[in-house]
Amino acid sequence: MEKARPQWGHPLQFVFACISYAVGLGNVWRFPYLCQMYGGGSFLVPYIIMLIVEGMPLLYLELAVGQRMRQGSIGAWRTISPYLSGVGVASVVVSFFLSMYYNVINAWGFWYLFHSFQDPLPWSVCPLNSNHTGYDEECEKASSTQYFWYRKTLNISPSIQENGGVQWEPALCLTLAWLMVYLCILRGTESTGKVVYFTASMPYCVLIIYLVRGLTLHGATNGLMYMFTPKMEQLANPKAWINAATQIFFSLGLGFGSLIAFASYNEPSNNCQKHAIIVSIINSSTSIFASIVTFSIYGFKATFNYENCLNKVILLLTNSFDLEDGFLTVSNLEEVKNYLASTYPNKYSEVFPHIRNCSLESELDTAVQGTGLAFIVYTEAIKNMEVSQLWSVLYFFMLLMLGIGSMLGNTAAILTPLTDSKVISSYLPKEAISGLVCLINCAVGMVFTMEAGNYWFDIFNDYAATLSLLLIVLVETIAVCYVYGLKRFESDLRAMTGRTLSWYWKVMWAFVSPLLIVGLFIFYLSDYILTGTLQYQAWDATQGQLVTKDYPPHALAVIGLLVASSTMCIPLVALGTFIRNRLKRGGSAPVA
């Protein structure tokens, strides 16, 4: 007798699992960057439009497929057509790539969390040099937060060609991160269903605390005004629309197979349409909410740096011209500078090269995303807060909850097809399958703990999923609407849920969403081709800053392999199925 499929203990567990998976680090460190780059409040216009015409429909499609087929990604697409098994295989491959490197972020989160209990915070001041005669030269040229990130955390090499060895401290943190994930997925939906209540809700508690604190910080209004002041001319910028569509697409986690896996454990009568709308709205609302928190803190940091810059100029002029202490202030600085320049032109010309150009606008214009925002910009702001240890612990605890929540979805996309397989599950219990997947990912992930590990992390982050996911979701929409048949799928949904599919979903699935995906695919493909030689940012310790370098041939080969290994699964599996069917027909033909 076939074993009954596990189910979520309560529909809320499914919703929380989807929220925990979809609401991730990208909401905190990518969406605020896009707002900053593409017109502040005006970026919300293309973002909301793309949510309606792309995000919600595609999320509903994946949830409906998982709930209808009641299998992981491979089995679900094989049920629709044996020739489409490669879509599920491609999803598993991409999820495997993502799991390899994504948990490294959680390892860094653990590293910073452990160091957050020190007083003072280790990234708040530069260490002394070996002679104890001054500060470390690399740290002085960069900043204390950059030094802690690039030298103490990553111990980064000058280029991707100098790999170095595995570093034991990051390796231990990565092992701990994978142990945490394993404990959360150990019993399948039984354990994951309980964990997601915490991983989904805890980040909101921290964000609310940070919002209250952020709004009371000096200069917070400068950041919020910068965010909410719309630059309407950006609406005519095609890249604003492309990035809005891309952010919606990747933020919801479409194409990985995680959503299909989660939905496969639902009751067939579950209202997945309602849940798709809820999850997509909560995900986008979280991005906007996180941006308000980020920009309030960003405004504090920018104002702090701006005023610090002004104070250094005041000190320089006061000492150079023997002015009375307190005579020169921020309010009369420009007036006094003009007076000194006209009265003492020769002396002022000597001092002028050392006078820094202080600008609040330029501080706010400094756009940073990804690990730079999470581990450098935020820590720069935190170190200047009162009771900085508390805010640091809260912040990195939140990052860990977001990261682990996303990892639960990533691993579900891999594990569900494996546990669905009768061959594999007949030999190994699900605890052993989960353990093997975590162990393999952890072992391969050690590459990212080497001195050149951050460069390999960037390669995986930039190239392992982008084109592959667009192709996967495009084939998914074509498969449902034109292979399985939209009318047939509509009939299935009506039989399952008792609800009729509205014209909106049908138009989006059949026409609008596929055309948008094709447009994104063409954009990214042409962008890669027109870019020419692919480049990366390397840390130069002698200058204390990032420099641009060309990827070496072996790195380009890895990039090509990452893109091809997942995208080629779709045509290769289809071709293999076709050949196998032809051979079966040929073998079963009657002998004359």
UniProtKB/Swiss-Prot annotation:
Keywords: Amino-acid transport, Cell membrane, Glycoprotein, Membrane, Symport, Transmembrane, Transmembrane helix, Transport. GO terms for cellular component: apical plasma membrane. One of its GO terms (biological process) is glycine import across plasma membrane. It catalyses: L-proline(out) + chloride(out) + 2 Na(+)(out) = L-proline(in) + chloride(in) + 2 Na(+)(in); 4-hydroxy-L-proline(out) + chloride(out) + 2 Na(+)(out) = 4-hydroxy-L-proline(in) + chloride(in) + 2 Na(+)(in); 2-methyl-2-(methylamino)propanoate(out) + chloride(out) + 2 Na(+)(out) = 2-methyl-2-(methylamino)propanoate(in) + chloride(in) + 2 Na(+)(in); L-pipecolate(out) + chloride(out) + 2 Na(+)(out) = L-pipecolate(in) + chloride(in) + 2 Na(+)(in). The chain crosses the membrane at residues 8-28, 43-63, 80-100, 166-186, 195-215, 242-262, 277-297, 390-410, 432-452, 466-486, 505-525, 555-575. Signal peptide: none annotated. GO terms for molecular function: amino acid transmembrane transporter activity; L-proline transmembrane transporter activity; neutral L-amino acid transmembrane transporter activity; proline:sodium symporter activity; solute:sodium symporter activity. Disulfide bonds: none annotated. It holds the Pfam family SNF. PROSITE patterns: NA_NEUROTRAN_SYMP_1 (PS00610), NA_NEUROTRAN_SYMP_2 (PS00754), NA_NEUROTRAN_SYMP_3 (PS50267). Residues 1-7, 64-79, 187-194, 263-276, 411-431, 487-504, 576-592 are cytoplasmic. It is found in: Apical cell membrane. It comes from the Eukaryota. Glycans are attached at N131. Residues 29-42, 101-165, 216-241, 298-389, 453-465, 526-554 are extracellular. SUPFAM superfamilies: SNF-like (SSF161070). Expressed in brain, kidney, small intestine, thymus, spleen and lung. In the brain, expressed in cerebellum, cortex and brain stem. Not detected in liver, muscle or heart. In brain, widespread in various regions, including the meninges, choroid plexus, cortex, hippocampus and thalamus. InterPro entries: Na/ntran_symport (IPR000175), Neutral_aa_SLC6 (IPR002438), SNS_sf (IPR037272). Belongs to the sodium:neurotransmitter symporter (SNF) (TC 2.A.22) family. SLC6A20 subfamily. Mediates the Na(+)- and Cl(-)-dependent uptake of imino acids such as L-proline, N-methyl-L-proline and pipecolate as well as N-methylated amino acids. Also transports glycine, regulates proline and glycine homeostasis in the brain playing a role in the modulation of NMDAR currents. This is Sodium- and chloride-dependent transporter XTRP3A. It comes from Mus musculus. The lineage of its organism: Eukaryota, Metazoa, Chordata, Craniata, Vertebrata. The gene is Slc6a20a.
